[in-house]
Amino acid sequence: MKVLGRNLVDPFPEFWSDIEDDLFITYYDVTSGSEEVFGDQHFDSGSSVTPRWLTLPDEDLAYHVAHELTHLLLKSKGFPSVGRGVRYPENSAEAIVGSDLEELVVHQPLEWIIAQYGFTRDFILDTMYEGAKSGLSSGNVPGYGTPWFFTWAIRYAELSTILSPLEWKVLKNIYRSKSPDIVSLGEELRDIITKMDPGVPDLVLEAMVLCRNLMGLGVEDRILIIDNRNGEMF
């Protein structure tokens, strides 16, 4: 199987064979780099620009495509997602924080599924580590309770669960030197996501609500948690 001419190496064929019947997309949607699979990072046939992810090493490319497909798989199985009230536009702080929150929580069941196949993403993780180290070292500390304060805390929780112990130790020390308050919130968020059962939609939804409420963003429809099984919002 290929995407835009690039081979999707093992274990992708086995992964695709296992999940294709549960997805509301086609084989062509994957191989053509479509918006249905890759969102705003899709391939535009009318443009000479290729998506950045197409330059990834073979193993990381296979992981990346599996990652995007697993997002769709989770929605098809009723795992929750994040929305916001109609008063908040796409570029609002609520949209940004909500998107980061969804990624943080949903990545737990997502990685739980992908890990069963033995995908690797060394290049992606190295890039994330170097980018985070540079950004944290040079960035100004966001004010307490601001949207960027929440995104920094969410990033803390996420990075603490995916980086190697040595890499995380470096970043954690930078976080501590920058803002103990962000560290405190990040630790609480991490505790919630690491204690939930990633295979149960109800428990993932509960964890998402807890994280949202912990940040105080459950008022005025600022961040809504959507149960994709019935459309109910919390």
Annotated model-derived regions:
Residues Y88-E90, E130-G135:
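Short, conserved phosphate-binding/catalytic loop or strand-edge motifs used
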Residues E59, L74-Q108:
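Post-HEXXH active-site segment of zinc metalloproteases
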Residues T50-A66:
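Short pre-active-site segment immediately N-terminal to the catalytic Zn-binding motif
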Residues H64, E68-L72, S76:
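Catalytic glutamate of the conserved HExxH
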Residues Y63, H67, L104-E111, Y144-W148:
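Non-catalytic, well-ordered alpha-helical scaffold segments
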Residues A132-F234:
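Pan-zinc metallopeptidase signature
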